[in-house]
Amino acid sequence: MSGMKAALVYPTWPLMHGEFIPAIILDLSAWNVDNFVDYDQGPFLIALVQFVHRSIGYLLVINALYIIFSFYSIMKERGMTLVMGLFITMLIIQIGLGISVLLKSIGTIPVLIGVLHQAVAILVLTLAVILYYFHSFNSLVSSPLNLDKP
């Protein structure tokens, strides 16, 4: 995203210039090797990357909701509500930063917001891994301090 400056082409949200899926992506003639090799020569790959990035974001939000609702009782029981709270907070910040980068990318990319968006993504991933670890750990042991039980 950042190397392609894709936000400059579609600085709108939630739609990409009024379309959920840009028409250029649906144009089968645009799906050729040249558009993938010389990606900066036309709008096709920029639109595709922007669409895929947004779609992954939407899927991550759905997955995060699943994590929140699935793990909450386990986390509460294990005293991990702080990690869950941080995960939810960082996810909301991540969404806000991503939308802000798009909406403020008119003529120039807001580099600081973009870098923060990337940094918070690392935090969200780290917290998701921690939550997954404790969820998996819960299925192996009944208590966080009782490491002898299988």
Where are these regions (language model features)?
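Polytopic transmembrane helical bundles with strong interfacial aromatic enrichment
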Residues: M1-P150
